[in-house]
UniProtKB/Swiss-Prot annotation:
It catalyses: 2 (2R)-3-phosphoglycerate + 2 H(+) = D-ribulose 1,5-bisphosphate + CO2 + H2O; D-ribulose 1,5-bisphosphate + O2 = 2-phosphoglycolate + (2R)-3-phosphoglycerate + 2 H(+). This is Ribulose bisphosphate carboxylase. Homodimer. In contrast to form I RuBisCO, the form III RuBisCO is composed solely of large subunits. PANTHER family: RIBULOSE BISPHOSPHATE CARBOXYLASE (PTHR42704), RIBULOSE BISPHOSPHATE CARBOXYLASE LARGE CHAIN (PTHR42704:SF17). It comes from Methanocaldococcus jannaschii (strain ATCC 43067 / DSM 2661 / JAL-1 / JCM 10045 / NBRC 100440) (Methanococcus jannaschii).
């Protein structure tokens, strides 16, 4: 069957996919990708009807050769899928088609999905974030400045009382948000039930002492029924937040959790994303994943730092930021390959985390703006004078930006920042 139609112009109702492919024959590969991701299989079948072919057939409407690698041609292709192909409010089902078997095809020597364009009917079938940026700011009573977050360190090993004490020290030092690390769940030395009540007790104490709103983001990642049980505990304990490791939990769990009756702000940690996003040969871009998570309804999402320890260049990270923050996004044909209208879907609060310390704060804000959660683990707890001093230094670095001061000027007012700048050259 032929799925290539280079004269086709996508209509507003099509779901579009853009990918880089590698193979001996780009046209043949593109044709097989389109078929495998929709109605095709490896041979002609007698059960195929003409009306199925006409109604459900996707169209490869662009094939552009962009290079050669190891004797194979490399090309950029775009495919338009009719929405009739999909159960549109079933993200796992949709992805089983457009991002499923195609990665295992022998003919493909490379296949990386770069972007999707979700049409209006598709977008409106999803809830999106419950709170979004404005809702988070309203909850924490922080109008304009970047939010400051930290992660309790070490990742695992602290006992419940120790964990809560570290969180308290961070809060009173100036941190707004404290979260569990991605691999802290309910280990023997720090059970979830005990940890959440004790840590929220310390949150209340920190709020009383500082006069500021503070929040704890407990990691409820677990098999789904247990995840719901932990969410119920978090609700009973008075937490405004939960954190979910969205990649390892799966698209189904994230979509289902958002459709529950909970009123949590959902913080999405992307642990394991690089297994899909980092390879330039096979996988899915972080931008494409971020668009999916915006639809599914997370309120906060890690996107990278550009200047920290995690992989991701400036243009790529800014493109991800654009897709989760803005109502309408225009293609740049470098990282964003489609215009995207998000209609009434709220924006996601971007999180910059990974190797962050006070000296990096001005550059991060310069690149990504003030609608940002700056999250520092080692950059808080690694301060020579401890967690509280590290929190004060990070908060002072943010305040320097708001006040129009250099870090060095602010350091003359805040000793903890001065020591941090001396420590992290």
């Amino acid at each position: 069957m032929d799925y290539i139609n280079l004269n086709y112009r996508p209509n507003e109702g099509d779901l579009l996919s853009c990918m880089v492919i590698k193979g001996e024959n780009l046209e043949k590969l593109a044709n097989e990708i389109a078929g495998e991701s929709s109605i095709g299989t490896w041979t002609k079948v007698q059960t195929m009807k003409s009306d199925i072919y006409e109604k459900l057939r996707p169209k490869v409407y662009e094939i552009k050769e962009i290079g050669e690698e190891n004797g194979y041609k490399v090309g950029l292709i775009k495919i338009a899928y009719p929405l009739y192909d999909f159960e549109i409010n079933n993200m796992p089902g949709v992805l089983a088609g457009i991002a499923g078997n195609i990665f295992g095809m022998k003919i493909a020597k490379g296949l990386r999905i770069l972007d999707f364009r979700f049409p209006a009917e598709f977008v409106k079938a999803y809830k999106g974030p419950r709170f979004g940026i404005e809702g988070v700011r309203e909850t924490l009573k922080i109008k304009e400045r970047p939010l400051l977050g930290t992660i309790v360190k070490p990742k695992v090993g602290l006992k419940t009382e120790e964990h809560a004490k570290v969180a308290y020290e961070a809060w009173v030092g100036g941190v707004d948000l404290v979260k569990d690390d991605e691999n802290l769940t309910s280990q023997e030395f720090n059970k979830f039930e005990d940890r959440i009540y004790k840590t929220l007790e310390m949150r209340d104490k920190a709020e009383e002492e500082t006069g500021e709103r503070k929040a704890y983001m407990p990691n409820i990642t677990a098999p789904y029924r247990e995840m719901i049980r932990r969410a119920e505990i978090a609700e009973d304990a008075g937490s405004e937040y939960v954190m979910i490791d969205v990649v390892v939990c799966g698209f189904s769990a994230v979509q289902s959790f958002r459709e529950e009756d909970f009123k949590f702000i959902i913080h999405a940690h992307r642990a394991m994303h690089a297994a899909m996003t980092r390879s330039r040969d096979f996988g899915i871009s972080m931008l494409a994943l971020a668009k999916i998570y915006r639809l599914l309804g997370v309120d906060q999402l890690h996107i990278g730092t550009v200047v920290g320890k995690m992989e991701g260049g400036e243009k790529e990270v800014k493109a991800i930021r654009d897709e989760i923050v803005y109502d309408k996004v225009e293609a740049d044909n470098e990282n964003k390959f489609f215009n995207q209208d998000w209609f009434d879907i709220k924006p996601v609060f971007p999180v910059s985390s990974g190797g962050v310390h006070p000296r990096l704060v001005p550059k991060i804000v310069e690149i990504l703006g003030r609608d940002l959660i700056i999250q520092a683990g080692g950059g808080v707890h690694g301060h020579p004078d401890g967690t509280r001093a590290g929190a004060k230094a990070m908060r002072a670095a943010i305040e320097a930006i708001i006040e129009g001061k250099s870090l060095e000027e602010k350091a003359e007012e805040v000793a903890e920042l001065k020591k941090a700048l001396e420590y992290w050259k």
